[in-house]
């Protein structure tokens, strides 16, 4: 499919229509059905034609899954270099002990043999049901088709990484660095068990920019803190979360670093990709009908702004009210109050879909019908001004519907 670019006056980069993980130069991606799921693609891969700088951030859940342990060790041994990644859905390879680690390493070996690259340049990821061993005969079948052009489509990769997701989530943008076109692409999955500190989510980002691994890791960590770590669907943190980025240096320009004159342009584009993917996860929360954005400003510290935003968007009472299209602002101020952060009710101001509901800690009369009309929209915004400082943050989440229970009551069946 031919990619088309659309440029917004707001950005110094272009959004590529139908852009994807394989849009940057030198990257290919694919996916196929190997039998882990009943009738959907469940095995995917990304390959770079040249060795790439790489970085990753992982779940903070102490029950870290085998693929994450192996990938983290691999990146340490390779000093931040990768050339391929393979991922399966339907099986998390988590809580599987030494056999799980051995299976992840065996997968690395099979992929490396097919691509004729060192196994230490292969990352592995899994998502799905916890506590079951990988069916390695099926995994091997998948690795044997990695070089098969019939399966080498980015759309297939996007589908292969899904679990309870209702849609694929991907994007690519382009920008100019030293007069040359650089592209950043991304693909993610995530729908349930989503909570700040990474969620049941896998996110993969590729770029043909020239940037070293240490710089890439610093950028990824910074971006993750205010994007992927600021989303929540249900308050659960998965054992398998990972965000991984590869930069294969295919575009020859001055190495990107904080000293590069166009560093901020690259950072803005990278953050845009991460924000887009994070919001796509929140929007696709299991059973969700609405995306909730909580903008907190006037906090004494960034940590307070982030914590209050996440507390509001994590509240089941707030989420239920938004689903019911009920302007129950009392649930919002209650969440602010129990967040554990420093607040002053007399300085607190709250808006729901740009309609004031609380001013200096006091309820504000509003037009119930006008408010009800705005709450039928797919995007709901809560603005909180604390009046205590200059720190601000935004958290993303979704409403809580009847379908969330239906989906999760039968996840293994």
From Swiss-Prot:
Active site per UniProt: 200
Site positions (Involved in the stabilization of negative charge on the oxyanion by the formation of the oxyanion hole): 127-128
Protein name stated in the entry: Arginine biosynthesis bifunctional protein ArgJ
GO terms for biological process, alphabetical: L-arginine biosynthetic process; ornithine biosynthetic process
Species the sequence originates in: Staphylococcus aureus (strain COL)
UniProt xrefs under InterPro entries: Arg_biosynth_ArgJ, ArgJ-like_dom_sf, ArgJ_beta_C
UniProt site (Cleavage): 199-200
Taxonomic classification: Bacteria, Bacillati, Bacillota, Bacilli, Bacillales
One cellular component (GO) term of this entry: cytoplasm
Subunit comment: Heterotetramer of two alpha and two beta chains.
Subcellular location: Cytoplasm
Record function comment: Catalyzes two activities which are involved in the cyclic version of arginine biosynthesis: the synthesis of N-acetylglutamate from glutamate and acetyl-CoA as the acetyl donor, and of ornithine by transacetylation between N(2)-acetylornithine and glutamate.
Assigned keywords, A-Z: Acyltransferase, Amino-acid biosynthesis, Arginine biosynthesis, Autocatalytic cleavage, Cytoplasm, Multifunctional enzyme, Transferase
């Amino acid at each position: 499919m031919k990619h088309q670019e659309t440029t917004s006056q707001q950005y110094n980069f272009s959004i590529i229509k139908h852009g994807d993980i394989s849009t940057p130069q030198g990257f290919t991606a694919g996916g196929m059905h190997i039998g882990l799921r009943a009738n959907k693609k469940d095995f995917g891969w990304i390959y770079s034609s040249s060795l790439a700088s790489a970085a990753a951030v992982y779940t903070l859940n102490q029950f870290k899954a085998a693929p994450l342990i192996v990938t983290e060790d691999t990146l340490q041994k390779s000093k931040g270099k990768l050339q391929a990644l393979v991922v399966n859905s339907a099986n998390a390879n988590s809580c599987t002990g030494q056999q799980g680690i051995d299976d992840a390493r065996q997968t690395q070996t099979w992929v490396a043999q097919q691509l004729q690259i060192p196994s230490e340049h292969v990352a592995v990821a899994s998502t799905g049901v916890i506590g079951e061993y990988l069916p390695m005969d099926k995994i091997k079948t998948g690795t044997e088709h990695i070089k098969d052009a019939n399966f080498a489509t980015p759309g297939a990769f996007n589908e292969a990484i899904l679990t309870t997701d209702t849609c694929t989530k991907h994007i690519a943008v382009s920008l100019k660095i030293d007069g040359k076109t650089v592209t950043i692409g991304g693909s993610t999955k995530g729908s349930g068990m989503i909570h700040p500190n990474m969620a049941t989510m896998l996110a993969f980002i590729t770029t043909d920019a020239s940037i070293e691994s240490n710089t890439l890791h610093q950028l990824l960590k910074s971006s993750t803190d205010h994007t992927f770590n600021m989303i929540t669907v249900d308050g659960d943190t998965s054992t398998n979360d990972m965000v991984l980025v590869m930069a294969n240096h295919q575009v020859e320009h001055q190495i990107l670093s904080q000293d590069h004159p166009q560093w901020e342009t690259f950072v803005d584009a990278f953050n845009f990709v991460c924000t887009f993917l994070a919001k796509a996860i929140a929007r696709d929360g299991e059973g969700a009908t609405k995306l909730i954005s909580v903008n907190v400003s006037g906090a004494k510290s960034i940590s307070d702004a982030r914590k209050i935003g996440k507390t509001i968007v994590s509240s089941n009472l707030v989420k239920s009210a938004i689903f019911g299209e009920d302007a129950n602002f009392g649930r919002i101020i209650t969440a602010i109050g129990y967040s554990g952060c420093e607040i002053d009710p007399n300085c607190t101001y709250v808006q729901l879909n740009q309609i004031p509901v609380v001013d200096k800690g006091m309820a504000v009369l509003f037009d119930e019908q006008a408010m009800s009309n705005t709450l039928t929209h797919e995007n709901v915004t809560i603005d909180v001004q604390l009046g205590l400082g200059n720190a601000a943050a935004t958290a993303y989440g979704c409403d809580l519907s009847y379908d969330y229970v239906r989906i999760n009551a039968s996840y293994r069946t």
